[in-house]
Amino acid sequence: MNIVILAAGMGKRMHSDLPKVLHPVAGRPMLAHVIDTARTLSPSRLVVVIGHGAERVREAVAADDVTFAEQDQQLGTGHAVMQALPQLDDNQPTLVLYGDVPLTTAATLKALVEAAGNTRFGVLTVEMPDPTGYGRIVRDAAGSIVRIVEQKDASEAVRAIREINTGIIVCPTGHLRRWLATLRNDNAQGEYYLTDTVERAATEGIDIVSAQPAALWETLGVNSKVQLAEVERIHQRNLAQRLLETGVTLADPARIDVRGELTCGRDVSIDIGCVFEGRVHLGDGVQIGANCVIRNSSIDAGAQVQPFCHIDSAKIGADGRIGPYARLRPGTELGEDVHIGNFVEVKNSQVAAHSKANHLAYVGDATVGARVNIGAGTITCNYDGANKFRTVIEDDVFIGSDTQLVAPVTVRRGATIGAGTTLTKEAPADKLTLSRAKQMTLDAWQRPVKKAKQ
């Protein structure tokens, strides 16, 4: 099968420099969603017709199985498909999709393709309560489709028809090539309509069939930021529904955003306002508190993430305790039962089982052993202005509050670092290491009297 995706439009009503088809739905370009759905049909040719912002569109969705055709002037849908003709195989039917209609399901497209087979003309239609602005499906007395009439060219009688054309069609490619060559632009829009091929097919006695989607939202197009927001909410609602059906507890299905792929084990609970980006896995019994942002991370069974945490490209071991207000940056790997508390940031560090940094700390470019306690205010000083250096903290270390570990430095097994220490050399195993000024009290000192300047 050939699949042609029309993605050349400017999208004036978006009021944006970004090409319309690159505006995101669930964190990915609309066009990427359409391409993903098209791939489920295993096409032999997948052609994207580009125009406005062509290079940006090409870069955004380039892949080995995608080819491009350029429409230099936007002269209508028929003209757009003409640009793809040199890349199509006449021995296979062609399915036409739209880069700004991102929610059409694979099941709906398969139903249309199966209805059309290799010899019929298939049209995806829907009935709308208010069909204003859409091309109407005109049928004869026997119920067969004879033509599609665009809104601006329709009579009052035709405008009363509620069945509309979604624009998605499939037909034999050889016929399509011939019909496109006969299109005229003598209409209210001055464009070459792809829909006019329906009338050509009817005139030649080609059987015209239709299929309908399971839901109206599958065919919603995006021409404005208002419509983009509507499509986003529908998509998120559908994703939330699937999570609920697999046993995930959502505090409010209307207040979760999944911008990628979220997989969950059993008895997972997600509070309100959470955003999941990229690939995220939540193991059995994981609890996610309110207003967390989690990106490209895995969280193992039994872990708890308290509210307002940011987790990016990290691995959290079983039974971990994160937050609230914690930040895990790329390269963070936490073992079993690791506690990372409020206002603690961990970056590019490996922390072994049962270790804790519960308050106000920065752990960057570090290797932390098991059963380590990192006191409040501890900082790994990992950057000298040009290069990053690692800190190594071995098992069973206790680090007192307000400690600076100036990398590269190692704290050996079982060592204790006194509060307020600035550590610049290796701390030996099982010993107390500290560096601080000797405390003094000046008995004769009096606080000076200070007067405000007049």
UniProtKB/Swiss-Prot annotation:
Binding-site list for Mg(2+): 100, 223
GO molecular function: glucosamine-1-phosphate N-acetyltransferase activity; magnesium ion binding; UDP-N-acetylglucosamine diphosphorylase activity
Catalysed reactions, semicolon-separated: alpha-D-glucosamine 1-phosphate + acetyl-CoA = N-acetyl-alpha-D-glucosamine 1-phosphate + CoA + H(+); N-acetyl-alpha-D-glucosamine 1-phosphate + UTP + H(+) = UDP-N-acetyl-alpha-D-glucosamine + diphosphate
InterPro entries (UniProt xref): Bifunctional_GlmU, GlmU-like, GlmU_C_LbH, Hexapep, MobA-like_NTP_Trfase, Nucleotide-diphossugar_trans, Trimer_LpxA-like_sf
Segments for region (Linker): 226-246
Positions with a binding annotation for UDP-N-acetyl-alpha-D-glucosamine: 6-9, 20, 71, 76-77, 98-100, 135, 150, 165, 223, 329, 347, 362, 373
GO biological process per UniProt: cell morphogenesis; cell wall organization; lipid A biosynthetic process; peptidoglycan biosynthetic process; regulation of cell shape; UDP-N-acetylglucosamine biosynthetic process
Keywords: Acyltransferase, Cell shape, Cell wall biogenesis/degradation, Cytoplasm, Magnesium, Metal-binding, Multifunctional enzyme, Nucleotidyltransferase, Peptidoglycan synthesis, Repeat, Transferase
Annotated positions binding acetyl-CoA: 376, 382-383, 401, 419, 436
GO cellular component, one term: membrane
Keyword Transferase: yes
Cofactor(s) the record lists: Mg(2+)
Pathway as given in its UniProt record: Nucleotide-sugar biosynthesis; UDP-N-acetyl-alpha-D-glucosamine biosynthesis; N-acetyl-alpha-D-glucosamine 1-phosphate from alpha-D-glucosamine 6-phosphate (route II): step 2/2; Nucleotide-sugar biosynthesis; UDP-N-acetyl-alpha-D-glucosamine biosynthesis; UDP-N-acetyl-alpha-D-glucosamine from N-acetyl-alpha-D-glucosamine 1-phosphate: step 1/1; Bacterial outer membrane biogenesis; LPS lipid A biosynthesis
Gene3D superfamilies: Hexapeptide repeat proteins (2.160.10.10), Spore Coat Polysaccharide Biosynthesis Protein SpsA, Chain A (3.90.550.10)
The UniProt record lists the keyword Aminoacyl-tRNA synthetase: no
Cofactor binding annotation: Binds 1 Mg(2+) ion per subunit.
The protein's assembly and partners: Homotrimer.
Function of the protein: Catalyzes the last two sequential reactions in the de novo biosynthetic pathway for UDP-N-acetylglucosamine (UDP-GlcNAc). The C-terminal domain catalyzes the transfer of acetyl group from acetyl coenzyme A to glucosamine-1-phosphate (GlcN-1-P) to produce N-acetylglucosamine-1-phosphate (GlcNAc-1-P), which is converted into UDP-GlcNAc by the transfer of uridine 5-monophosphate (from uridine 5-triphosphate), a reaction catalyzed by the N-terminal domain.
UniProt cross-references to PANTHER family, sorted A to Z: BIFUNCTIONAL PROTEIN GLMU (PTHR43584:SF3), NUCLEOTIDYL TRANSFERASE (PTHR43584)
Protein name (Swiss-Prot/TrEMBL): Bifunctional protein GlmU
Organism whose genome encodes this protein: Cupriavidus pinatubonensis (strain JMP 134 / LMG 1197)
Gene this protein is translated from: glmU
